Amino acid sequence: DFESGCTLQERRAEKECQEDIVKERFFQIFDKEKIQKVCEAADAQYVQINKKIGMFVRKSTKQNRHCGNGYFYIGMYFRVLLSMLLDSDWTDTEKFFQNEELKQRISKKEIQKIWQQSIQCFENYLNHEIRNKAENGQSLQAVRQEISERCYEEAEKETRLYRLTVPTGAGKTLSSLRFALYRAERTQKQHIIYVAPFNSILSQNADEIRRAVDDPDIVLEHHCNVILSEKKQEKDYKKLTETWDVPIIMTSAVQVLNVLFSGQKRDIRRMHTLCNSVIIFDEVQAIPKKCMELFNLAVNFLTNFAESDVVLCSATQPSIKDLKENNLSECMEMTEIIEKYEEAF
């Protein structure tokens, strides 16, 4: 301003907020009564959430499990809300600047159809590509079949948190995926998320899972070693990694831990994707010990408050039962004890 000598930033800092005008214009666009009802409903929901968290913490303490502090779970709820706010705001802003229509995401009806088709393809893959292979051997195949059937049966139950402890070579990837597909279809889950600690495991299993569901477009492989040849592919891939808006997500433990705990907005944005999902943690024993207590609490939140089902897979489960605090909530074994299968492998 040449007259006053003030910069634009200084003028903005000095300018009083015309609150009355802001309110008047805001309610010209939005219905005041409707907003008030939404706020009242949100307040009532918050009260119910607090009660639910309190009951969970008291119950776990009474059972001498000590599954964490209620403030942690409240913080997770706030993180999910912030995630939805960031995702909706960034998506809307991107479409506005690109002058594109804001598309609807995959509907419940569409995702159910995807799960049904994937199950059909998966069972065909098991029958023709796996069970009929001569090199598998009858005794080994019988054990793998038993493990797979147990996982299939558990998909019909109501348990939210499982351990799948079977020897290396017992087919835990396909068995856990079988559980995930049937559970996702039965309970109308939005995503299946497969998590592994090493990119080599991810790349290997991603190829097999794509073949198993017979539709590479519904599988996102998200880790630093993914290389794409075309610029359009890179652009589309980048968008998907920002939102995880795809039915089956295969990613690293680092990515998931960032989504759960990082302060970066790009990580927080994906937090809501972990809700209403089936999540498979492969080789869970590789998660660093210093992260284990926070990991336990995050799994508790996902399975007790976020409508997700979690499977912890390993040939040797980490010793996490004897922690003084921050334990996992009740966890069911998906199969028989590991000693039963070790002789076969």
Descriptions of predicted regions:
Residues D1-K133:
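N-terminal accessory nucleic-acid engagement/regulatory domains that precede
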Residues K157-R163, Q190-H191, D245-V246:
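Pre-Walker A (Motif I) flank of P-loop NTPase domains
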Residues D214-F261:
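Inter-Walker segment of RecA-like/P-loop motor cores
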